[in-house]
Amino acid sequence: MRTDNIRNRKEQLKKQEKKDFDSSKDEETSTSDEEESSGGNRSKIAGKENHQNKNIINQKTNNNNNNNNIKEKDIIDSSVNNADNLKATDPPSAKYKKLAIRSVMGAFMIGFFTIVLSTDHFIVALFVIALQLLVFKEMIALRYIEAKEKKIPHFRTLNWFFLFTSFFFFYAKPILITLANYYPDIFQHFVRYHLWHSFSLYCIGFVLFILTLRKGVYRYQFSQLTWTLMILMMVVVQSNFLISNIYQGLIWFILPVSIIVCNDIFAYFNGFFLGKKFINRPLMKISPNKTWEGFIGATGWTLLFAYYFCGFLLKYDWIVCPKGNTGFMESLHCTRDPVFLEKEFIFPPEITTIAFKYLGITLLPFTYIPIQFHALVLALFGSLIAPFGGFFASGIKRAYKVKDFDTIFPGHGGVTDRTDCQFIMGLFIHVYYNTFIKTLEIDPTFIWQNIMMLSMEEKMVIYEKLKQSIEFTTGTITA
């Protein structure tokens, strides 16, 4: 009996130990499960917190971007509303005050321009070159602040060096030829090798640009080079044709410049008094204050102005005649080109007969001056195409968030604001004149410039040949 009790007691102890072991195992398992569960929960919570943080950061970023976009839009809208014309929200007194300032400053600029034109072709050419310098300065200044922030080395130095190179290529040769007449030993070399010296300057600028490249701003530096070359092409190259027009006769400079000024004035006043009263939509999205009424009205007034102002300019030889080899401030007299002379137009007999038979109209002959009809073509270009030069400039101002390129002229802005349409107009005049008006003849000035590039021995050969030809033609010697 006692033995059975002992056996039963042992079995109970074993069962209890097994139960305790299983219980401890279950506790460990549950503990590990709890730890895994808590770890998973922690990772889930951490992931959720990271996700929430990312959402908060993204939301802040989006808010900042939205704020920046709103600010940028406000700046652009503000510059658009103020860029060219008066704000629609301005009170009448403020509008008329701005109109008065703009009118007074415009009259001053026209007066100064008239004084420059009354001097000499050379002075007018220098005036155009001075305008190029000011336009280049204003355009480069748009990106100078950004370049300064990025610490671009020699930014201004390289820009002005490329400008000097382009000036030397386009304008130095005539000056060197003139100086070679007085100091042949010094300047003859530069006349003969002008093209080589121009190329050498370009190579120097190219190498200097490569040497100034800095890691981290490569893209920006190349964009700056592109910007500079674009300015040189748009300003210096096109202005070179303006100067060529001047020496063909001041009329080819005064007339197109006056057409652009006239178109700008009448577009402003027509838009000021009639804008959006008949067509309530902007002319161009890039420049919302430009109106259809101003555009259409200015075209009509510009056509009338070009026709009659051209007739006025024909009264003066110093405006019509090309410069040639005359000295500084000398009076000009020339045999006028047929385009400046009156012609009689007679209608063909067939047209005269039809007009009288069906319309009861007698078509009589009339006199006209060809240049006045050419002036109408120039006026159409100046009214329909040249204003896009202004829209191009407006796009640049919107891109860089500025109202005007400068504030040198109150109510008008900078030099670029006043000459943005003149460059493409000057190029058009050069192409139109050489294509449809200029007669095919040998230019003595061009021959003289080439003779001055020769050495003294070569000049003596030319001299002897010319002497023999003149003596033979005049009969002073026998053949």
From Swiss-Prot:
Q: Name one GO biological process term.
A: CDP-diacylglycerol biosynthetic process
Q: Where is this region: Disordered?
A: 1-71
- Grouped into one coarse class, the protein's main location is membrane
Give start-end positions of Basic and acidic residues composition bias.
1-28
Topological domains, Cytoplasmic: 1-108, 181-192, 262-293, 397-479
Where in the sequence does UniProt note compositional bias of the Low complexity kind? 53-69
Entry annotated with the keyword Transferase? yes
Protein keywords: Lipid biosynthesis, Lipid metabolism, Membrane, Nucleotidyltransferase, Phospholipid biosynthesis, Phospholipid metabolism, Transferase, Transmembrane, Transmembrane helix
Name a Pfam family for this protein: CTP_transf_1
Q: Which reaction does it catalyse?
A: a 1,2-diacyl-sn-glycero-3-phosphate + CTP + H(+) = a CDP-1,2-diacyl-sn-glycerol + diphosphate
Name the EC number(s). 2.7.7.41
Q: What is this protein called?
A: Probable phosphatidate cytidylyltransferase
Biological source species: Dictyostelium discoideum (Social amoeba)
Which lineage is the organism of this entry classified under, starting from the top rank? Answer: Eukaryota, Amoebozoa, Evosea, Eumycetozoa, Dictyostelia
